[in-house]
Each structure stands twice: as structure tokens, then as C-alpha cells.
Design a protein with these regions (language model features):
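Helix-loop-beta segment of a Rossmann-like dinucleotide-binding subdomain
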Residues: 134-144, 196-202, 245-255
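Rossmann-like NAD(P)(H) cofactor-binding subdomain of soluble oxidoreductases
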Residues: 46-134
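Hydrophobic anchor at the start of a short beta-strand
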Residues: 3, 25-26, 97, 118, ...
């Protein structure tokens, strides 16, 4: 089966490296230079002390025709607008599309896509792009996937096909799955980005831990969570499991890139606004990240 991956950042390269063990994978890059590098070197996957080379074809995004059986969209949420516009210009709409963005702000964009099967996923792996063709897998987790619209048959087949090489878990209900990841993103990403610390510091430092608790109280109120303890335990588990990792938002800030704060905290603040309520700690974090972004972001 042919799989196309749109985006060659850390997650795009990680998926390309593992899925190439089962499928014929083409990764579509933003620049001609990166696709040339991948075609010359293939994708180098680093995991622990091991290095493996994955045979992957690369093309610039301008050459994307959407002809693969599965298309995986692995770009940042704020880059989706141009990708969705490109979708409408393809000779034929891809039949199966999997979106792998953080937050939930992008879900409203999916309703305008006219295709048979739309899937969404939440990635719990830690990955770092070392150079245009090298990715380090520094936190092994899973990828949860669910049907946003369409038939689950194809997605279940895909999950079973890769289960021996890359952990992907099928979930029955997309909203609960995305909400769980949103909560973790909203608590871990902004704090680590502002404090410039690894994930584990949020639970190791008692003062940071208190801020984490306060944030969770606000998020619980916005989302009206029925069993908040389950979500809290999930966040703590992630902090423990990825204690030495730097969050994606922190890495974006360090690289002077735009973050996905609008898809994460922006989404929560929109929900709060619908309720006519103010949540000052979340709002403060949102404006702090936007302020950092405004200081000379390079996209």
C-alpha cells in the first residue's frame, strides 16, 4: 500500500521511518532542498544507541497529487490552511486522510473537506528532528487514532498492519481521545515553554506542580470533566514517562517558530468565552506565549 506523508518535521520523519517497514512511503516536504537530502540519504532513525536507515521517497509539496491510499497530514495546526487549500486543487481528493495535529482548534476545518474517510490522531511519541533527514525517537509511546468521518474499516486495517513495527491504537470515539490529549498539551506545553524546562520538572518542582494543579482546575471547569482524576493521572503519567523530553512548544520557541498555542489554549479560551467565563491563568499563559512568538519568529 502507498502512503503519503505531508510534512517532514519530527513527526513526519518518525512516521515515515517506521511505516516504510510495511508500506511504500513518500514524504512531501516544504522545500526542494529537504526532499533532495532525503532522496540522497534516506531517513535516518535514531533510537537509543541504534541507528537504522529507512528507504523513503521524498518530493516537494508542489508535486503532491494525492494518489496514495492513505495520506497522513503531519504539519503544525497553523499550516493546515494552505494544506486544505492544496487539497481542493488536487486532480482527485484522497480517499483516506489522517490528521496528526495537537489541540482541537483544527477540527472545525475538517468539516469542509469532501472525502470519504477523515481520521484524526494524537501522537504520544517524543521525537526530535536532528537534520533534514534524521529523526531521534526519544520517547516511545503510542499514537491514538479514531474516525472523524467515514468508515472505520480502512483505519482498523491500517492499525493492524503496523502493530508489529509501530504502536498505533484504534479508539472508538474521536472527541474523548482528542480532549484527553488537549488537556495534556494545555498543561505541559505552555508551562515548559515559558519556564524553559523539561517535562519532568513540572512534577519534580513543588512550585511548578502547584501551578499545574491550578491550571487543571481551570481546564476542568471549562470542559466540565466528569471524572477529572482520570485526566489528571494521565497528565502526571506523561510527565513521568517523558520527564527528559522537551515539549514541542518549547522546541518551537527555542527554534523561533510559531507554536500551536491557538489550537491548544486558544481553543480552551474560545470555549470559556462561549460560557461567558474568565480563566485568568490560562489567559495569562496564552498571552505570554503569544508575546514570546511576537519577538522575531522565523517560520
Amino acid at each position: 500500500m502507498r502512503v503519503g506523508i505531508i510534512g517532514a518535521g519530527s513527526i513526519g520523519l518518525l512516521f515515515a521511518a517506521y511505516l516504510s517497514r510495511v508500506f511504500d512511503v513518500t514524504v512531501y516536504t516544504r522545500s526542494q532542498e529537504q526532499s533532495a537530502e532525503i532522496n540522497q540519504h534516506n531517513v535516518l532513525l535514531q533510537s537509543g544507541t541504534e541507528e537504522t536507515i529507512a528507504k523513503v521517497k521524498a518530493l516537494p509539496i508542489a508535486d503532491w497529487q494525492g494518489s496514495e491510499a492513505l495520506t497522513i497530514i503531519a504539519v503544525k495546526q497553523y499550516q493546515l490552511f494552505s494544506i486544505i487549500e492544496r487539497l481542493s486543487q488536487l486532480p482527485s481528493m484522497p480517499e483516506n486522510i489522517l490528521f496528526l495535529q495537537n489541540g482541537m482548534g483544527h477540527l472545525k476545518l475538517l468539516d469542509g473537506i469532501n472525502t470519504n474517510n477523515l481520521f484524526v490522531g494524537s501522537v504520544e511519541h517524543g521525537a526530535l528532528k536532528e537534520n533534514p533527514y534524521t529523526v531521534r525517537h526519544n520517547g516511545i509511546g503510542t499514537t491514538n487514532v479514531a474516525v472523524y468521518k467515514g468508515d472505520p474499516g480502512f483505519l482498523k486495517m491500517f492499525v493492524s498492519s503496523v502493530s508489529n513495527v509501530f504502536p498505533i491504537t484504534y479508539q472508538e470515539e474521536y472527541f474523548a481521545m482528542m480532549e484527553k490529549k488537549l488537556i495534556a498539551n494545555a498543561m505541559i506545553n505552555p508551562l515548559t515553554a515559558i519556564l524553559q524546562v523539561n517535562n519532568g520538572a513540572l512534577i519534580d518542582n513543588p512550585f511548578y506542580y502547584k501551578v499545574l494543579q491550578n491550571l487543571f482546575s481551570e481546564i476542568t471547569a471549562i470542559l466540565n470533566l466528569e471524572h477529572p482524576e482520570e485526566y489528571w493521572e494521565h497528565v502526571i503519567k506523561i510527565c513521568k514517562k517523558t520527564r527528559d523530553n522537551r515539549s514541542s512548544m518549547l522546541k518551537d520557541i527555542e527554534a523561533k517558530r510559531l507554536t500551536e498555542v491557538d489550537a491548544i489554549l486558544g481553543y480552551l479560551l474560545e470555549e470559556a468565552n462561549k460560557q461567558g467565563k474568565k480563566f485568568p491563568q490560562l489567559e495569562t499563559l496564552y498571552y505570554l506565549i503569544k508575546g514570546i512568538e511576537s519577538q522575531g519568529v522565523v517560520i
